[in-house]
Design a protein with these regions (language model features):
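Short acidic, glycine/tyrosine-flanked loop/strand segments centered on an H-E-D-like triad
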Residues: 78-106
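Extended, solvent-exposed, turn-rich assembly/linker loops in the middle of proteins
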Residues: 138-214
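Short helix/loop capping segments that flank catalytic or ligand/cofactor-binding pockets
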Residues: 63-65, 186-189, 195-196, 238, ...
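Helix N-cap / beta->alpha transition motif
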Residues: 96-102, 178-183, 220, 229-231
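N-terminal "assembly arms/tails" that initiate or stabilize quaternary assembly
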Residues: 1-86, 236, 242-243
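Extended serine/threonine-enriched, polar tracts that run as long, contiguous segments within proteins
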Residues: 202-234, 238-249
């Protein structure tokens, strides 16, 4: 009598993890570049529940010096602030399938691990963006000095310039707009409605480009009623622990099957 042992079976951990790593690497490269460095996705081992860092707050400026004065000057002190990155654990799955479901379609069973590995990479990227937009909203909404109220429907592109005014003469440092698709299409609609001349199908539009020359990240994970104007490194999502993947046999059901699940942790740092 023959008995099947582990070496007779194939559990495709490597297939799934390879697909995950390849897909994530592509997403990281494209996303970091396409966001103008405003939203950074990174990998770094971080211990504990928080990453705390202190920084100096100075903001000094030049002042006129009276060359004929012998008066005393008043010393100024520097300040300090603290940035805290918070860990957020995530999970994926579990997903299961019978081997029969793939064999009956003439497909290799390892295809299950490949498609799941690619999907978990996409799911983690989308989840990272959800974490980023939630962190941005919490941080910015608590700072009334960085919030303006406007509407594309009534204010048009002035909605964006009102936000840029908050940066003063440093407005050029804005690297990226982040907005919901509904807000983006409101801007497109406003640009179309603002055409100043049309004849024989040729349209001339007045004013600046719809987003004032800044790239836009359009994601429906962003709040529908908020537009973020971000500086470089505005938010950093760090995969702070090695993600775990598990492919496993399902041996206690009518049909033999395999399953897959994953988990991981990210740190969220807001500028």
């Amino acid at each position: 009598m023959a008995t099947t042992v582990n070496s007779d079976l194939i559990i495709y951990n490597d297939e799934a993890q390879t697909a995950y790593l390849e897909r994530v690497q592509d997403n990281l490269d494209v996303f970091n570049a396409s966001s103008n460095g405003a939203i950074v996705l990174d990998n770094e081992l971080i211990e504990g529940d928080f990453r705390k860092r202190s920084f100096y707050k100075i903001g000094g400026s030049l002042e006129h010096r009276d060359v004929n004065s012998v008066g005393k000057v008043t010393a100024k002190k520097i300040g300090a602030g603290e940035a805290v990155g918070v860990k957020a654990p995530w999970k994926y799955g579990p997903y299961q399938t019978t081997e029969e479901a793939f064999k009956r379609r003439g497909r290799p069973v390892e295809e299950f691990s490949q498609i799941i590995g690619a999907d978990v990479a996409d799911a983690t990227l989308e989840g990272f963006i959800q974490y980023a937009t939630a962190a941005l909203r919490a941080a910015i909404s608590s700072n009334a000095g960085m919030v303006v109220t406007a509407s594309i429907e009534t204010d048009g592109k002035k909605t964006l310039t009102r936000g840029m005014r908050k940066f003063g003469d440093k407005f050029g440092r804005i690297a990226l707009w982040v907005m919901h698709s509904s807000a983006y299409f409101d801007i497109v609609d406003e640009a179309i409605a603002s055409k100043v001349y049309e004849e024989a199908g040729v349209v001339i539009y007045g004013g600046l480009p719809g987003t004032l020359g800044k790239p836009v990240l359009v994601t429906d994970t962003a709040p529908a009623d908020v537009i973020f104007g971000l500086l470089p490194n505005a938010v950093v999502i760090t995969e702070s622990q090695a993600p775990g993947f598990r492919s496993y046999n399902v041996d206690d059901e009518e049909n033999l099957g395999i399953g897959y699940r994953a988990e991981g942790t990210v740190n969220i740092d807001v500028l």
